[in-house]
A protein has these predicted regions:
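An acidic, low-aromatic, low-complexity terminal/linker signal
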Residues: 1-148
Length: 148
Protein backbone atom coordinates (compact mmCIF):
# COMPACT_ATOMS: atom_id res chain seq x y z
CA UNK A 1 0.00 0.00 0.00
CA UNK A 2 1.42 3.38 -0.98
CA UNK A 3 1.32 5.68 2.05
CA UNK A 4 -0.53 8.98 1.79
CA UNK A 5 -2.17 11.48 4.10
CA UNK A 6 -5.31 9.32 4.25
CA UNK A 7 -3.48 6.32 5.77
CA UNK A 8 -3.57 5.79 9.52
CA UNK A 9 -1.84 3.30 11.81
CA UNK A 10 -4.39 1.83 14.22
CA UNK A 11 -3.03 0.66 17.57
CA UNK A 12 -4.05 0.10 21.16
CA UNK A 13 -2.89 1.82 24.31
CA UNK A 14 -4.15 -0.70 26.86
CA UNK A 15 -7.79 -1.06 25.76
CA UNK A 16 -8.01 2.33 24.03
CA UNK A 17 -8.02 2.33 20.23
CA UNK A 18 -5.80 5.09 18.83
CA UNK A 19 -4.57 6.24 15.43
CA UNK A 20 -1.72 8.26 13.96
CA UNK A 21 -1.33 9.48 10.40
CA UNK A 22 1.16 7.34 8.49
CA UNK A 23 2.87 10.59 7.49
CA UNK A 24 3.90 10.94 11.16
CA UNK A 25 5.15 7.35 11.46
CA UNK A 26 8.66 6.40 10.41
CA UNK A 27 8.55 2.70 11.31
CA UNK A 28 7.12 0.10 13.67
CA UNK A 29 9.34 -2.08 15.84
CA UNK A 30 7.76 -5.22 17.22
CA UNK A 31 10.75 -6.32 19.33
CA UNK A 32 10.62 -4.35 22.58
CA UNK A 33 13.18 -6.43 24.49
CA UNK A 34 16.12 -4.15 23.74
CA UNK A 35 14.94 -1.01 25.55
CA UNK A 36 17.63 0.27 27.91
CA UNK A 37 16.17 1.94 30.97
CA UNK A 38 17.54 5.32 32.02
CA UNK A 39 17.98 5.80 35.78
CA UNK A 40 16.04 8.71 37.29
CA UNK A 41 14.21 9.44 34.03
CA UNK A 42 10.62 10.60 33.90
CA UNK A 43 8.11 7.85 34.72
CA UNK A 44 6.62 7.98 31.22
CA UNK A 45 10.00 7.29 29.57
CA UNK A 46 10.57 3.56 29.03
CA UNK A 47 14.20 4.19 28.11
CA UNK A 48 16.16 4.28 24.87
CA UNK A 49 16.62 1.89 21.99
CA UNK A 50 19.33 1.69 19.33
CA UNK A 51 17.87 1.74 15.83
CA UNK A 52 20.56 1.21 13.21
CA UNK A 53 23.10 3.18 15.27
CA UNK A 54 20.71 5.97 16.25
CA UNK A 55 19.65 6.31 19.91
CA UNK A 56 15.88 6.84 20.18
CA UNK A 57 14.00 7.81 23.36
CA UNK A 58 10.95 5.61 23.96
CA UNK A 59 7.87 7.14 25.61
CA UNK A 60 5.52 4.71 27.36
CA UNK A 61 2.12 5.93 26.09
CA UNK A 62 0.02 4.24 28.79
CA UNK A 63 2.07 5.96 31.50
CA UNK A 64 2.15 9.22 29.51
CA UNK A 65 -1.66 9.10 29.43
CA UNK A 66 -1.75 8.33 33.20
CA UNK A 67 -3.10 4.83 32.57
CA UNK A 68 -2.04 1.59 34.18
CA UNK A 69 0.74 -0.10 32.24
CA UNK A 70 -0.04 -3.70 31.34
CA UNK A 71 2.77 -5.38 29.40
CA UNK A 72 1.51 -7.82 26.78
CA UNK A 73 3.11 -10.10 24.24
CA UNK A 74 1.99 -7.80 21.43
CA UNK A 75 3.74 -4.62 22.60
CA UNK A 76 5.36 -2.53 19.86
CA UNK A 77 7.22 0.73 19.40
CA UNK A 78 5.91 3.21 16.84
CA UNK A 79 8.81 5.41 15.76
CA UNK A 80 7.74 8.93 14.85
CA UNK A 81 9.70 11.91 13.57
CA UNK A 82 9.40 15.17 15.50
CA UNK A 83 11.43 18.10 14.17
CA UNK A 84 14.03 15.72 12.70
CA UNK A 85 14.31 13.82 16.00
CA UNK A 86 13.09 10.23 16.20
CA UNK A 87 10.93 9.34 19.20
CA UNK A 88 9.54 5.90 19.99
CA UNK A 89 6.00 5.47 21.31
CA UNK A 90 5.55 2.28 23.32
CA UNK A 91 2.06 0.89 22.62
CA UNK A 92 0.15 -2.23 23.60
CA UNK A 93 -0.50 -3.49 20.08
CA UNK A 94 -0.31 -2.31 16.47
CA UNK A 95 -3.44 -3.54 14.72
CA UNK A 96 -3.63 -2.28 11.14
CA UNK A 97 -2.98 0.43 8.58
CA UNK A 98 -6.19 1.75 7.07
CA UNK A 99 -7.30 4.32 4.51
CA UNK A 100 -9.56 7.00 6.02
CA UNK A 101 -11.35 9.88 4.34
CA UNK A 102 -11.22 13.18 6.23
CA UNK A 103 -15.01 13.18 6.51
CA UNK A 104 -14.77 10.01 8.63
CA UNK A 105 -12.85 11.90 11.33
CA UNK A 106 -14.88 14.01 13.73
CA UNK A 107 -12.62 16.95 14.59
CA UNK A 108 -14.59 18.35 17.54
CA UNK A 109 -15.09 15.11 19.38
CA UNK A 110 -16.20 13.94 22.73
CA UNK A 111 -12.82 12.60 23.80
CA UNK A 112 -12.60 9.08 25.23
CA UNK A 113 -12.76 9.72 28.98
CA UNK A 114 -9.31 8.30 29.74
CA UNK A 115 -7.49 10.79 27.50
CA UNK A 116 -6.62 14.43 28.01
CA UNK A 117 -8.40 16.45 25.29
CA UNK A 118 -5.08 18.09 24.30
CA UNK A 119 -3.80 14.71 23.10
CA UNK A 120 -6.72 14.09 20.70
CA UNK A 121 -7.40 15.93 17.44
CA UNK A 122 -10.38 13.84 16.40
CA UNK A 123 -12.18 10.52 16.63
CA UNK A 124 -13.21 7.94 14.09
CA UNK A 125 -14.65 4.45 14.11
CA UNK A 126 -12.55 1.35 13.49
CA UNK A 127 -14.25 -2.06 13.63
CA UNK A 128 -17.08 -0.53 15.71
CA UNK A 129 -14.60 0.91 18.24
CA UNK A 130 -14.28 4.63 18.91
CA UNK A 131 -10.70 5.42 17.90
CA UNK A 132 -8.84 8.54 19.05
CA UNK A 133 -6.81 10.24 16.33
CA UNK A 134 -3.86 11.46 18.36
CA UNK A 135 -2.38 14.95 18.24
CA UNK A 136 1.30 14.00 18.02
CA UNK A 137 2.76 17.50 18.58
CA UNK A 138 0.80 17.81 21.85
CA UNK A 139 1.84 14.33 23.01
CA UNK A 140 5.48 15.20 22.42
CA UNK A 141 5.14 18.69 23.93
CA UNK A 142 7.08 18.53 27.21
CA UNK A 143 5.24 21.51 28.70
CA UNK A 144 1.82 19.90 28.15
CA UNK A 145 3.03 16.63 29.65
CA UNK A 146 4.45 18.36 32.73
CA UNK A 147 1.19 20.16 33.53
CA UNK A 148 -0.89 16.98 33.48
Amino acid sequence: MAMNDNNYVIFKVNDLYCALSCLEVQEIIRDTKHITQIPQSDDSVSGVINIRGKIVTVINLPKHFNLDFNKSGTDSIIVVNDDNECIGLYVSEVIDVIDVNDIEIEHTPAVPHQLDPHFVKGVMEFEKEITAVLNLPEILNVETAETE
